[in-house]
């Protein structure tokens, strides 16, 4: 677990010396990235890479174009490029120009890298990429369960300013460890342990039935599907607004 803390701490302190090392580590093929970092890969790796990059896109580009790298790593590296745009370190035009090149650089077979490309084009407004996206969908390269054509049309309808504003709603770089790492199960476990200690100190354990004490933690609110409307009224699907990518 200590290496997970280290990843976020390096990102928080913008440690650019970590950038080439992280690129080498996460360029390893197969399931190694997930064996090392678990859900951090899909949850925050793009933001971590952007945070330690110092605005240098070369490492993320190397991951994206490495056909031996894990497909999800390649996808989130594209998110890292978007994070540099929304944080003001790179321009939208430069990022979009590169994404247009990817339609001809990526191997023409379905994978998370194609889903990621569709997502980032939608994030930055897909006008320039609309024809290439149409061909990618027609060729079955993009998983419509991840992002369907309606999502592309909705992003297009927002206009460039609206799409960019929507993209900026999401956190771009790592700036708050508690907020960035709060989704991890270990912190919820620790919180429950601390709560138990306080109860003991206040002599409240006697009032807890054994059934309550051993009951599993359950979700108290309905789970929101990724294709359902965002509960905050953004007009977007949950997966395009508040859901982790």
Q: Which ranges hold each PLM region?
A:
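Internal, hydrophobic cores of structured domains that mediate oligomerization or house catalytic pockets
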Residues: 17, 21-66, 72
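Catalytic DNA-binding helix-loop module of base-excision-repair DNA glycosylases/AP lyases
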Residues: 76-80, 113-120
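Ligand-binding pocket scaffold of soluble enzyme catalytic domains
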Residues: 2, 8, 77-84, 124
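Short inter-helical turns and helix N-cap capping residues of alpha-solenoid HEAT/ARM repeat scaffolds
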Residues: 29-30, 38, 68-70, 106-110, ...
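Histidine/lysine/aspartate-rich catalytic loop segments that bind and position anionic ligands
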Residues: 68-94
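Non-membrane alpha-helical segments in proteins
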Residues: 1-12, 40-47
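Acidic/negatively charged segments and metal-coordination signatures
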Residues: 11-12, 47, 51, 55-58, ...
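Residue-level detector of extended alpha-helical repeat arrays and alpha-solenoid scaffolds
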Residues: 3, 38, 42, 73-74, ...
